[in-house]
Each structure stands twice: as structure tokens, then as C-alpha cells.
Amino acid sequence: MLQPKRTKFRKMHKGRNRGIVVNDKINFGTFALKSVDRGRLKSCQIESARRAITRAIKRQGKVWIRIFPDKPITQKPLEVRMGKGKGNVEYWVALVQPGKILYEMSGVSKELADHAFKLGSSKLPVRTVVTGI
């Protein structure tokens, strides 16, 4: 699963997922899966969607992942009293805004790209739309 090799600090503030999207253009491929909602994608969700997409295209084309989970999410263990500091890092997330490109694909037909992105988007917690050049 995706996660940073090293970070300056182990834990991060919760923060807010606001603002406008930065990478809303297709850079590498010819088709793209674009987010419609605002949310957080876990690294395991990103990986399972990638697997579904690559299996659907039967390794014909090329797939690019345009998001990276760089925000640590902490959790305290079950049945632990409040206080005693912040919990341990449980998983990593990527913050997603509307219009953000999640995956790109090239080397396949439009129908196959639509089918593959439909299978991949079912693994993600945000609504998505397929776009092309």
C-alpha cells in the first residue's frame, strides 16, 4: 500500500478538506477518473481500485495513479480512557476535492476505459466521473 517513506513529523492535525482542486487536467493518459465529491481516500482503497482497473484492462494499456496518501490518521486503541496523548498512526489518506484527477489511462478503447473505471470507482468512497481528451 502507498505511504510516504519518511516524514518530518509522525502525526498531523486533523485540518479541513476545503479549497479548490489543483490538478484538474489530464497529463499522462487519454482517459481519466475524476472525483465529483470531497472526501478522504485510504491507501488500501486507492490500491484496491488500482487492482480492479488493471485487471479489467487485462494489462493492455497503462494506468497512472495521480493521488498519493500523505496524511497520517491516528487512532487510540479500544477501551482506552481519554487523555494520555494522541493515538498511534493507523492508516494514511489522500484528501480529495471535487474535480481532482484520481487515475489516468491510455492505450485502451473508450468502452474498455469506461468499464474499467466503473469497476474501480465502485471501490472508492467518493462519486466519480470518467473524462477523456
Curated annotation (Swiss-Prot):
Database matches in PANTHER family: 50S/60S RIBOSOMAL PROTEIN L16 (PTHR12220), LARGE RIBOSOMAL SUBUNIT PROTEIN UL16M (PTHR12220:SF13)
One Pfam family it belongs to: Ribosomal_L16
Gene Ontology CC: one annotated term: cytosolic large ribosomal subunit
Known partners and oligomeric status: Part of the 50S ribosomal subunit.
CDD domains: Ribosomal_L16_L10e
Gene: rplP
Single GO MF annotation: structural constituent of ribosome
Protein name from the UniProt record: Large ribosomal subunit protein uL16
Family the UniProt entry places it in: Belongs to the universal ribosomal protein uL16 family.
Any one GO BP annotation for this protein: translation
Top-level taxon of the source organism: Bacteria
Function description: Binds 23S rRNA and is also seen to make contacts with the A and possibly P site tRNAs.
Key words, A-Z: Ribonucleoprotein, Ribosomal protein, RNA-binding, rRNA-binding, tRNA-binding
InterPro entries noted in UniProt: Ribosomal_uL16, Ribosomal_uL16_bact-type, Ribosomal_uL16_CS, Ribosomal_uL16_dom, Ribosomal_uL16_sf
